[in-house]
Amino acid sequence: MGHEEALRNVPLFAGLEPSDLQRLGRILVPRQYEAGEVIINEGDEAVGFFVLSSGKVRVVKDLGGNREQILATLTPGEFFGETALLDGYPRTASVQAVDKTECLALTRWDFISELKGSPTMTVEIVRALARRLRQTDATLSE
């Protein structure tokens, strides 16, 4: 059966057909992380896309001099890791588990393949990126 039930509750996948959810459910890999464990390191090459299925993570930017800025706290149903997969540049921030966390991971190859084959998913990714850009603009103008 895979992870289709969990995927139905993820806004990114809400508009997908049941057959698309089944396919995604078969290729997503569950990954568990303990509190404090780093999932993505800023500056690393992008190898995956993650959907948060349980727990909580924080997205952190290194400001240098042993300082950091928390950019976001993500909860189940949200996703991360897409930016570096799309633009091919290194990761722009680190992602760390706040508490015991499970993510469903999609490899770079599968992520790109899904975007090419699913206009609905592509549009939802673009919408999510636009929302994040709008939030960043609002934060910077405060």
Model-derived regions: residue spans:
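Cytosolic regulatory regions built on CNB/CRP/Popeye-like sensor folds
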Residues: M1-E142
